[in-house]
Amino acid sequence: MLEHLSSLPTQMDYKGQKLAEQMFQGIILFSAIVGFIYGYVAEQFGWTVYIVMAGFAFSCLLTLPPWPIYRRHPLKWLPVQDSGTEDKKPGERKIKRHAKNN
């Protein structure tokens, strides 16, 4: 069973994260406004809480899993480069000295 879970994608790109955050905040705000208005009209604070909680659950369902909509812009990594400093011994490296500020 765990083999199936490990094959699921778990990453989002930066634009996908931004979209998920905007959707999350928009759904929460919308449900809070609707919940407040309905709770005020019905004179039941409980309905306000239920509507906001339903909006929260809905927004979590839409934004927490890494749906394909959030992975449209994959990161392009730079190729690995050899750094010349690893081949040198510690005594051969140049030491940078900063000028003293008086």
UniProtKB/Swiss-Prot annotation:
Q: Which Pfam families match?
A: SPC12 (PF06645)
PTM section of the record:
May be phosphorylated.
Q: Which GO terms describe its biological process?
A: protein targeting to ER; signal peptide processing
Topology, Lumenal side: 43-46
Query: What is one cellular component GO term in this UniProt entry?
Result: signal peptidase complex
Q: Which portions of the sequence form the region Disordered?
A: 81-102
The keyword Endoplasmic reticulum appears for this protein: yes
Q: Which UniProt keywords apply?
A: Endoplasmic reticulum, Membrane, Transmembrane, Transmembrane helix
Q: How does it sit in the membrane?
A: Multi-pass membrane protein
Q: Where in the cell is the protein located?
A: Endoplasmic reticulum membrane
Principal place where this protein is found? endoplasmic reticulum
Q: Does the keyword Transmembrane helix apply?
A: yes
Q: Which residues lie on this side of the membrane: Cytoplasmic?
A: 1-19, 70-102
Transmembrane parts of this sequence: 20-42, 47-69
Function statement: Component of the signal peptidase complex (SPC) which catalyzes the cleavage of N-terminal signal sequences from nascent proteins as they are translocated into the lumen of the endoplasmic reticulum. Dispensable for SPC enzymatic activity.
Record-stated family: Belongs to the SPCS1 family.
Quaternary structure, from the entry = Component of the signal peptidase complex paralog A (SPC-A) composed of a catalytic subunit SEC11A and three accessory subunits SPCS1, SPCS2 and SPCS3. Component of the signal peptidase complex paralog C (SPC-C) composed of a catalytic subunit SEC11C and three accessory subunits SPCS1, SPCS2 and SPCS3. Within the complex, interacts with SPCS2 and SPCS3. The complex induces a local thinning of the ER membrane which is used to measure the length of the signal peptide (SP) h-region of protein substrates. This ensures the selectivity of the complex towards h-regions shorter than 18-20 amino acids.
Question: What is the protein's name according to its record?
Answer: Signal peptidase complex subunit 1
